[in-house]
């Protein structure tokens, strides 16, 4: 939808690749993605082909990436995994701290619901449909631009404040899975491994060392509990299991290092 990207460009989203446009500031990268759903997804969700969502999100360079991803090709034989183990741990540990393409990563995302546009039955509030004629397409385009201007830009501006960011992480509800509720999601809630990890690294960044220490210690406790349970239940076996193990061990090491830094920096 060229009109939408043109509107985004006026707001500073000068970089674009595929369905994503982004804008860099001193503290974060604001990302806007128009996600058109595949035919198979449309069939699964019982929405018409041509349905899409707008997905605003933010990337913060001081937060660790918690997206494990694929570490090796599917063709790699199990006999060779042990040879790659130490190498992969180092790779993931570095990857947790440094992301080469931050525009492809997001830490906090916002849910935006439509106000107008062609009807879909059943009516998912956060999915638009381009319709079957020019009038419907214009109506949808105008609504998407309006929601971006009235809500997405407010979301981006709100999270410019690091104090507001850490308040969100510590106090707000993650609205993941809430079909009718607008808000911020994908930070896991304030007592999850993800939420505690993000809170700890953000607090460290703004030199709130007491909050950072408490959050990261709780995060580490939860991670160690998870690690022990997975070990006991043989959930770290096979390719996928070993990938998960490598990632969990690397995240544990990363948090332990950050806690060591706090001991040195804390006044």
At which residue positions do the language-model features occur?
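Amphipathic alpha-helical segments
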Residues: 1-17
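A short acidic/basic microdomain associated with nuclease active sites
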Residues: 12-28
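Intrinsically disordered, low-complexity regulatory regions enriched in serine/threonine/proline
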Residues: 23-267
